[in-house]
């Protein structure tokens, strides 16, 4: 009976299963960090991927062999217009021992952002006149009283925020993306006051992050469609000789006759997976698009017109895709100052 004479590690990571399409284009993080801050703040932000370029900067890693020298650094550009908090959601432990929403509070100031009706159609009924807005406030004031009376039960607050894609003509869409962002730092009372104060107001990325710090990136990877085991799991192709009449770009066997084990590589969906990348450094936050726009604009995107962010290295996702930026859950290093950039490539990317 034939058998393998050489050993090799199994192909494919079990930590990335199931390899299926993401259920949402802008996923909410499943984990949030605990920050040491007396003042409450949002723990995340949303941006749109533009493309990549490169810069030259002074290396400021303490133990790096090139510390203090000029180095080449590829960077990813994200366009980050302000976000708008729409509603406050309070989470408490339910009967099953899991955190769950006990209620949510909406303010009439949130209704000034009219594009929200493209996502939540029922809100349009409260935009008819002042009397409708008054009834809207009366309806949710009782829920605000419920939050204040159960402040000791609440484990954390989250804000339902909306992006403003209308400010980015390159996206070609008006419907905003909605996502929950948790509030961290301070006491529960100060977090509640902070949330009520910023409802309906624009929040910029400088209110959440600063230059030079590390962040986590959560998003959906590029979709590749249906792929075979060679590309999907990096399985070694079988040798091509005259007795291999059943193909080479496949596995030798799927297992015993009783069934196929779950860990056996098989063809299927590749890409469009929800993934998280840790500790991406913010190289720069800029308000002048001309400092980053190359000649002719970014290929398959166009021209940056709002506040932008430069992230060290590459990140997941295709161009124009929403990307969630989160405070790092396990930062590898804390930088005190942003790096010094000496050159930004603005040459045309169109060849």
Swiss-Prot record:
**Can you list the GO cellular component terms from the UniProt entry?**
cytosolic large ribosomal subunit
**Annotated spans, Disordered:** 1-31, 246-271
Q: Which UniProt keywords apply?
A: Ribonucleoprotein, Ribosomal protein, RNA-binding, rRNA-binding
Q: Which InterPro entries match?
A: L3_arc_euk (IPR045077), Ribosomal_L3_dom_3_arc_sf (IPR044892), Ribosomal_uL3 (IPR000597), Ribosomal_uL3_arc (IPR019928), Ribosomal_uL3_CS (IPR019926), Transl_B-barrel_sf (IPR009000)
GO MF annotations in UniProt: RNA binding; rRNA binding; structural constituent of ribosome
Q: What does this protein do?
A: One of the primary rRNA binding proteins, it binds directly near the 3'-end of the 23S rRNA, where it nucleates assembly of the 50S subunit.
Q: Which family does it belong to?
A: Belongs to the universal ribosomal protein uL3 family.
Q: How does it assemble?
A: Part of the 50S ribosomal subunit. Forms a cluster with proteins L14 and L24e.
Q: Please give the name of this protein.
A: Large ribosomal subunit protein uL3
Report the gene name. rpl3
